[in-house]
């Protein structure tokens, strides 16, 4: 049990919110603690002090996910505390946060890492694949350099929503695969339109 000052304001900066908000509500229930989930939508695939960027949060979204432990002044106090970041603050439900970030953040990391792994295996038999991977490939796979431990935690804490995104995308791949197989120019064109 933590010995916390009465009225203390607690937040986090994790990439998933539902599990964190639920844990905070469970662990701090009945205590004089204020909690608000936080997720700065800024970062880099790079790690360590050498990768620090003083302008990292400027104009980036900083998402707050209120809970039953969030008082009316908590949000304003957090905004004031973080005002020097020059971020754009937004408030949403933890569950909606996890759904949206699964599509625009978590799932793209899966795609990038999957494409890197597929290409590495392919290059064993076709060594020029690595040399020919140019700008578009680099743009798509840059985030595959992200820290694996962090991404393991993110995927496991938002697993159901991420699995939905994977299954949806598999369906889209099946559709374009079938269109190519059928030589359906219209369907292929529509895929890219």
Residue ranges of each PLM-predicted region?
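Interdomain hinge/lid region at the active-site interface
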Residues: 126-193
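Rossmann-like NAD(P)(H) cofactor-binding subdomain of soluble oxidoreductases
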Residues: 2-47
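Residues that form or flank phosphate/diphosphate-binding pockets in enzymes
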Residues: 19, 73, 164
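Internal alpha-helical scaffold of NAD(P)-dependent oxidoreductase catalytic cores
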Residues: 56-142
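Catalytic cores of RNA-modifying enzymes
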Residues: 1-2, 52
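Active-site capping/gating segments
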Residues: 31-71
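Glycine-rich beta-alpha junction loops
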Residues: 17, 39-45, 68-69, 96, ...
């Amino acid at each position: 049990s933590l010995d916390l000052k009465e009225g203390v304001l607690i937040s986090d900066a994790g990439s998933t919110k539902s599990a964190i908000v639920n844990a905070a509500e469970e662990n701090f229930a009945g205590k004089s603690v204020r909690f608000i989930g936080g997720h700065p939508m800024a970062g880099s695939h790079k790690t360590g002090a050498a990768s620090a960027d003083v302008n990292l949060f400027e104009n980036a979204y900083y998402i707050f996910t209120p809970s039953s432990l969030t008082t009316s002044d908590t949000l304003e106090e957090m905004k004031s505390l973080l005002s020097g970041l020059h971020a754009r603050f937004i408030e949403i439900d933890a569950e909606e946060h996890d759904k949206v970030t699964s599509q625009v953040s978590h799932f793209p990391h899966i795609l990038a890492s999957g494409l890197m792994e597929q290409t590495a295996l392919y290059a064993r038999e076709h060594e020029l694949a690595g040399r020919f991977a140019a700008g578009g490939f680099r743009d798509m796979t840059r985030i595959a350099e992200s820290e694996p431990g962090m991404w393991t935690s993110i995927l496991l804490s938002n697993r159901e929503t991420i699995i939905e995104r994977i299954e949806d995308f598999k369906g889209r791949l099946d559709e374009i695969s079938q269109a190519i197989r059928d030589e359906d120019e219209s369907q292929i064109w529509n895929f890219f339109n």
